[in-house]
A protein has these predicted regions:
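Conserved N-terminal structural module of periplasmic/extracytoplasmic solute-binding proteins
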Residues: 2-104, 109, 120-124, 335, ...
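Extracytoplasmic/periplasmic substrate-recognition and gating elements
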Residues: 61-62, 248, 291-359
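Extracytoplasmic/periplasmic solute-binding protein
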Residues: 142-148, 154, 178-228
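Short, solvent-exposed loop/beta-turn-alpha elements that line the ligand-binding surface or hinge
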Residues: 116-129, 196, 213-237, 291-295, ...
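Short helix-initiation/N-cap motifs at beta->coil->alpha
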Residues: 72-81, 174-179, 255-267
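Glycine-centered hinge/linker elements that transmit conformational signals in sensory
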Residues: 181, 224-256
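C-terminal capping/gating helix-and-loop segments adjacent to ligand/active sites or protein-protein/ligand interfaces
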Residues: 320, 360-370, 381-436
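Hinge/lid segment of periplasmic solute-binding proteins
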Residues: 100-154
């Protein structure tokens, strides 16, 4: 599983580098608008890279006169490279991304094409995609990106074998979670695995607690720039609840030294050292690939995050990545823009690509895939993922993607401190209020 899907955010990277260095990559094409055809940058790493490349190859074979030249980049370099290229006016025609706050920064700098009228004229393209996928593609009511690839909700995973051994049931509420903590600790099993060194893994807990306690309106107020939004009473309650879990030894000892990018947190679950793990849907593929017979023998359980007693949020709501996104550079030529849009219409999420995503344990953001999902050897998990994505009244984008890069980095720094108990919920709120709208 590529780290782009397990490490969704690329925040806090080195500042600008020389353009010649920033534009070096794994592929063979050159950026910018020269040499004919369109250009497309995306992340390397199998099996996702192979699916993306296959879609480009299929489009090029069907359109020999209008080629797309693709270039791959390692995950940890991509954000800096694309930012540098956009600033220099040398971006590729098609820009791969996560939508949300980063897309807004592109829009405000007039670096990407407004696709609203194109989608109006090509309603058949929009109508084949999950409606929830368009939220992170939209800025101030206008669409600036084509949703693509797969939906990645955050899921509560658990080790069925460990639960059976301890004689307990999966949690149906927050109180159940807190009651399970001493039961597992008494058996020498960590209640929850957590790759806390990576910071964004901690964030998933707050995303769900904010939603389940206060509903989506609490974080939406942050997005809308409402003054002191982080100090909302329900936000303080959510921040307090997660510290209650830390104080109760709810997480693996030394979680702040465990990294998610190395999949160390995944190993804690499938080896039985931890009973549960809150993580992205991509974890299923990692567990399947690295956990021996853990998945095939039915030992991996999964569910949406349970409700919090007295909470205002709908327990069917989801959080995570509603899709990945393709934008068109505003600096591209008219010919290049046409090729990109033709690719969106006839090359993205076609039948072969959809099948490949499903075979890799992912749920594509195309509607009407229920039969393919049901026929997969991962049907139970894929149907859970599809159900969350298609039935959620609200699907909140991962906070570090929804916010601006500046606010997101402050968020991640303070989340780490919150989990280390080095700041209080009120201090967290004060620190985050200072970067609202920045």
């Amino acid at each position: 599983m590529e780290t782009s899907l397990s490490r969704r955010t690329l925040l806090g990277m080195a500042a600008a580098v020389p353009l010649s260095a920033a534009l070096s990559a794994c592929g063979s094409s050159s950026p910018g608008q020269g040499g004919g055809g369109a250009t497309y940058w995306y992340l390397s790493g199998q099996p996702q890279e192979g699916v993306r490349a296959g879609a480009v190859d299929a489009f090029n074979k069907a359109n020999p006169e209008t080629q797309i030249k693709d270039t791959t980049f390692q995950n940890d370099a991509y954000k800096t490279k694309i930012k540098t290229a956009l600033g220099a006016g040398q971006a590729p025609t098609i820009i791969w991304g996560w939508g949300g706050g980063t897309l807004r920064s592109y829009v405000e700098a007039d670096q990407v094409e407004d696709l609203t009228s194109w989608f109006d004229e090509h309603s058949e393209v929009k109508d084949r995609l999950l409606p929830a996928s368009f939220g992170a593609a939209t800025v101030d009511g206008r669409i600036y990106a084509m949703p693509c690839e797969n939906v990645q909700p955050i899921v509560l995973f658990y080790n069925r074998e460990v639960f059976d051994r301890v004689g307990v049931e999966p949690p149906e509420s927050w109180d159940d979670i807190m009651a399970l903590v001493p039961r597992f600790n008494a058996e020498g099993i960590a209640p929850f695995s957590l790759g806390g060194q990576s910071r964004w893994t901690n964030m998933m807990w707050l995303e769900f607690l904010f939603d389940r306690i206060g509903g989506p309106e609490v974080f939406q107020a942050v997005i809308e720039g409402e003054k002191d939004a982080w100090s909302h009473p329900d936000a303080i309650t959510a921040l307090t609840r997660v510290q209650d879990l830390v104080k109760a030894d709810g997480f693996i000892k030394g979680f702040s030294s465990v990294t998610a990018d190395s999949n160390a947190d995944q190993a804690l679950l499938y080896t039985g050292r931890a009973a549960m793990m809150l993580h992205g849907a991509w974890s299923y593929g990692i567990q399947k690939a690295e956990g021996g017979d853990f998945v095939s023998s039915g030992k991996l359980g999964f569910m949406n995050f349970p409700p919090v007693e007295g909470g205002k949020g709908d327990p069917g709501n989801g959080v995570g990545n509603p899709a990945q996104y393709l934008s068109v550079s505003s600096r591209a030529s008219a010919e290049e823009k046409k090729i990109a849009k033709d690719f969106f219409a006839t090359g993205v999420l076609q039948d072969d690509e959809v099948k490949k995503w499903i075979d890799n344990g992912s749920v594509p953001v195309r509607l009407g895939t229920e039969k393919l999902l049901a026929a997969s050897d991962s049907a139970d998990f894929l149907q859970l993922t599809y159900g969350i994505a298609s039935n959620a009244k609200t699907f909140v984008q991962s906070w570090d993607q929804a916010l601006s890069p500046t606010a997101a980095e402050t968020l991640l720094d303070n989340i780490a401190k919150l989990f280390q108990l080095s700041i209080s919920p009120k201090q967290f709120a004060t620190n985050l209020n200072a970067v609202i709208g920045k």
